[in-house]
Amino acid sequence: MCGGCVGTEYPERGTTCLEGGSFLLNFVGCARCGRRDFVLLGNRAAGLHGDDEIITYDHLCKNCHHLIARHEYTFSVVDDYQEYTMLCLLCGRAEDSVSILPDDPRQMTPLF
């Protein structure tokens, strides 16, 4: 992975967890060939680790195939919530939690 290709290493992305794609605003250009072009996705793998679904892939320079970053996305169900995480040098770090119930108990206001 190459810190010279990105503007900010592991930027904080809040709840934006990407299952695919790239955060191109953080790509400053390839440290090897010096070009700023599209980013290819390679070596994509999806599988289960216990009850977690994990998707990994590499961000590669379109021109010289230099490895910019490795991307990891996870999905799991914990209690009544769908949990998402993302960790990537280029795309950043993020977490999200969504209730599987029609009404999210965390969003309900107490009556008293």
Curated annotation (Swiss-Prot):
Binding site for Zn(2+) 2: 30, 33, 61, 64
Keyword Isomerase: no
One Gene Ontology term of the molecular function aspect: zinc ion binding
Residues binding Zn(2+) 1: 2, 5, 30, 66
Top-level division of the source organism's lineage: Eukaryota
Residues at which Zn(2+) 3 binds: 59, 71, 88, 91
Keywords per UniProt: Activator, Developmental protein, Metal-binding, Transcription, Transcription regulation, Zinc
GO biological process: one example: positive regulation of DNA-templated transcription
PANTHER family: PROTEIN CHURCHILL (PTHR31931:SF2)
Function: Transcriptional activator that mediates FGF signaling during neural development. Plays a role in the regulation of cell movement. Does not bind DNA by itself.
Similarity section: Belongs to the Churchill family.
Name of the protein described by the UniProt record: Protein Churchill
Designated gene of the protein: CHURC1
